[in-house]
A protein has these predicted regions:
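Membrane-cytosol interface segments of multi-pass membrane proteins
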Residues: 3-222, 369-412
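Helical transmembrane-bundle signal
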Residues: 62-65, 111-117, 146, 254, ...
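Aromatic-anchored segments of alpha-helical transmembrane domains
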Residues: 64, 216-228, 281-294, 357
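Membrane-helix interface motif
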Residues: 70-78, 154-161, 229-232, 292-300, ...
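Interfacial loop-to-helix transition and helix-capping segments at the boundaries
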Residues: 95-108, 172-187, 228-255, 288-323
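Structural signal for the C-terminal ends of transmembrane alpha-helices
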Residues: 118-125, 197-203, 258-268, 327-335
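Central hydrophobic cores of alpha-helical transmembrane segments
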Residues: 210-220, 275-284, 345-348
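Alpha-helical transmembrane segments of multi-pass integral membrane proteins
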Residues: 296-404
């Protein structure tokens, strides 16, 4: 308990420093025309190049995460479910490295990018106009793939027609049992729902006010650690109240405000963004990988939430790594990007939606039923599974994009 008291005290001091002292950090002067010297402001006619690079890389990182899951699953599917087991030290290290250190920022990066581009809303945009525009883009492909993941596995014996029909009852309320990765769509939808509500505040908020909210959000990311090591219920949680003290400052809303703060108020030089970004990413990512390695024990079945105690996307380490990664990407100040980067960026949503169709088959072939001795050494097997899946998805979405009405299937 003493160590957590020390951690909390240090975290409180850092929050104070972040709120009060950060104004003294050197910033770019605001030019007389009101635009930032960095290229992070939105314009109607110019794409933000580094955002395209984030989409391209983050999409691959998602597949790297799911490729890694094939090497610590304890159930018949081979994927990490409610329980996990590492078969040897090699799996322990490389899963921690790829899934934890390298790829854990993938989901928060997508959230930050969404908020970075959409907040605050364009002048004159109404709530219903915003909802119509965003949901017409994401809901038809989402629903289409919910149905595809439900019925296509019947064709290759993944499950029976009866099981597929039963799963229809599930997808009315949640993601398909065959498509666990579609959980991401629900927090993305919730983020879109809240944007018109917080957008007016963000238009008027000062840098210090946004830092205050971000500091509260940072404190809320301690919750998974408190649940794991201190108490199951903290900050007012109990069986009749599931909303803790910082509930309304927590979750992906924090990444939304962070994205707006970076775009509007953080006018650091490229050199400073490079230095701070590198330090933050290395510190956060290293801890994320180490925490999995430390908790994992080869040959022992563990409850997955306990094994992944530091991997939740709203934890201090992942927040720190995401902030660092975003700063590093923002150092890409080119006005244009290669056509292939722009193209993959546009196709990335469809690639994400379909990737488990390919990844499951490729992983099954690569692992061969024995995660301890895959076709290639684990150090190579995990990135190879991810890369092959990525290429298959890229080719498929590119071909589908030529079809009339493809935007209703792949969003592009």
């Amino acid at each position: 308990m003493e160590i957590f008291a020390i951690i909390f005290a240090e975290f409180s001091y850092l929050s104070y420093f972040y709120i009060v002292k950060v104004n003294t950090l050197p910033q770019y002067p605001t030019p007389t025309n009101g635009s930032n010297r960095t290229n992070m402001n939105r314009t109607e006619t110019e794409r933000i190049v580094f955002v395209d690079y984030i989409r391209v890389v983050a999409c691959f990182l998602v597949m790297l995460v799911h490729a890694s899951e094939n090497f610590y699953g304890a159930d018949a599917s081979g994927l990490a479910g409610n329980t996990s087991m590492l078969l040897n030290e090699s799996n322990r290290f490389w899963v921690a490295f790829y899934d934890g250190t390298v790829a854990r920022t993938c989901v928060p990066l997508f959230m930050v990018v969404s908020a970075f581009l959409l907040v605050p809303m364009k002048e004159g945009m109404t709530m219903h106009g915003f909802y119509r525009r965003r949901f017409l883009r994401i809901l038809p492909p989402f629903i289409a793939f919910q149905l595809l993941y439900t019925f296509l596995p019947v064709l290759w014996g993944g499950w029976s027609w009866q099981e597929a029909v039963e799963s229809l009852k599930v997808i009315a309320f949640n993601f398909s049992p065959m498509a666990g990765h579609l959980w991401f769509m629900f927090p993305l939808i919730s983020l879109y729902l809240i944007i018109p509500v917080v957008s007016p505040w963000l238009e008027k908020s000062t840098a210090r006010e946004e830092r205050t909210f971000i500091a509260l959000f940072a404190c809320s990311t301690l919750l998974p650690w408190l649940h794991e090591f201190v108490l199951d219920e903290v900050w007012g949680e109990c069986f009749w109240n599931g909303f803790h003290m910082l509930w309304y400052c927590s979750g992906y809303l924090g990444y939304l405000v962070l994205a707006h703060y970076i775009r509007k108020h953080l006018h650091w030089s490229r050199q400073k963004r490079m230095k701070v970004g590198t330090l933050c990413f290395l510190a956060g990512a290293s801890f994320t990988g180490w925490a999995f390695w430390w908790r994992g024990e080869p040959g022992v079945v563990l409850e997955t939430p306990h094994l992944e105690w530091s991997w939740e996307f709203c934890t201090p380490n992942v927040l720190l790594a995401t902030f660092g990664a975003f700063l590093l990407f923002s150092c890409i100040e080119s006005k244009t990007c290669p056509a292939w980067v722009s193209r993959i960026s546009r196709l990335s949503f469809g690639m994400y939606l379909m990737h488990m169709f390919f990844l499951s088959a490729i992983a099954s072939w690569m692992v061969g039923g024995n995660a301890a001795e895959p076709l290639l050494p684990v150090a190579l097997a995990i990135p190879c599974i991810a890369l092959l899946s990525y290429l298959c998805c890229l080719v498929t979405t590119q071909l589908l994009s030529y079809l009339p009405g493809s935007k209703w299937i792949i969003g592009a």
